[in-house]
Amino acid sequence: MRLDVAIADATQRLSQTSESPRLDAEILLCRTIDMPRSYLFAHPEDELDELTLARFDEVLQRRESGVPMAYIMG
């Protein structure tokens, strides 16, 4: 899955539980891929491998269930 598609999907998923779903999605993805946020804008076409996508899905599920960003980020 491309980075831009992953962000769009995550934003949609978080829209019911977050006041800032796009920002949350970007921050969680950056944490998952261990890159700065600017990387998402510079390389939207980069692909996520299956393992990274699974880890991203795990943190999204935590956020969807209402876990605060600060707790997820550690």
Where are these regions (language model features)?
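Non-catalytic nucleic-acid substrate-recognition regions in nucleic-acid-modifying enzymes
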Residues: M1-S20
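Conserved AdoMet
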Residues: I27-G74
